[in-house]
Regions:
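N-terminal intrinsically disordered, acidic low-complexity segments at the extreme N-terminus
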Residues: 1-24
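A Zn2+-metalloprotease active-site environment signal
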Residues: 19-284
Length: 284
């Protein structure tokens, strides 16, 4: 009849409903029951299966369908941001840049993308210091500080750039981006709306969960550097000597760190040396 009854005495209403056998269905569902523990366990098992099988599959699909225009947009935006915030124009003489570029092109020609698949850029690293990195579209950046650290060792410089070729060839940066996004989405799906602070914590957790893939990618890029350098008739162990130089000049710890995205330098040098021996034995 359109009547509306309101009361603040919730306990009395519950007692009346219980007395007349009309306790609400929703209320019963909200009460604690051992089956809730089984449900929670099932949710976590399901999430684990998604992380183990679905996320990697979706990452591969995403990488496969990403058009070149997207990777070019990502690379140009990233480099533009770094140029504004960190980098400055290289102070390396043009003759030295040309010398390095020519040596790099000889190695890049042996890769699956060829010379035309890469664009080598020189920058002063500023706060970043000695470094080199690759962007998804084949844009490579090497800093003056890294070239200075190599102290005239061309094989060391080209070995580092061959390592970056490995990252591009295997599309590591795209995979890492999509994997981190997938893990973050999975965590947020389970946790729900946890607010800005909680979201930061959870997405940081997603990044940590992806670090093992980063270490695998670094090892794979090291192996590609060894193989390309050997094909080009250069020192296949040059990338390992670069890590030794880093350890010597910058005092980096030679042991592996669990939260590091790169394997420890001692561990990497040993793996590089082992792979170089295998490549040399296979070519002899």
């Amino acid at each position: 009849d359109g009547s509306l009854f309101e009361t603040e005495d919730n306990d009395a209403v519950d007692l009346w409903l219980k007395k007349h056998g009309k306790s609400g269905f929703v209320h019963e569902l909200e009460r604690f029951h051992p089956r809730l523990l089984a449900f929670v366990a099932a949710v976590f098992v399901f999430a684990g299966l998604i992380y183990r099988f679905a996320v990697p599959a979706l990452v591969e699909v995403a990488v496969l369908v990403t058009p070149p225009a997207v990777t070019q947009w990502m690379a140009s935006g990233t480099l533009l941001s770094l140029d504004k915030a960190v980098f400055s124009e290289s102070a390396l003489p043009e003759e030295r840049q040309t010398e390095i570029r020519d040596a790099f092109n000889q190695v890049a020609a042996l890769s699956s993308r060829g010379v035309g698949g890469y664009n080598l850029n020189f920058r002063q690293g500023g706060a970043i210091g000695p470094n080199a990195f690759a962007l998804p579209d084949g844009t490579l950046v090497i800093t003056d500080e890294l070239i200075e650290l190599a102290d005239g060792d061309m094989d060391m410089i080209i070995g580092v750039l061959a390592h970056e070729i490995g990252h591009v060839e295997q599309e590591h940066s795209l995979r890492q981006l999509y994997r981190a996004a997938g893990v973050a989405g999975l965590i947020m799906l389970i946790a729900g709306d946890v607010g800005a602070a909680g979201e930061d914590i959870l997405t940081s957790g997603a990044a940590l969960m992806s670090l093992s893939h980063s270490r695998d990618a670094e090892n794979e890029a090291d192996r590609i550097s060894v193989e390309l350098m050997a094909k080009a008739g250069r020192d296949p162990r040059a990338i390992g000597r670069f890590f030794a130089r880093l350890e010597e000049k910058l005092g980096l710890d030679g042991d592996s760190s669990f939260l590091s995205t790169h394997p420890g330098t001692a561990e990497r040098r040993q793996a590089i040396d082992d792979h170089a021996r295998a490549v040399e034995a296979g070519g002899s």
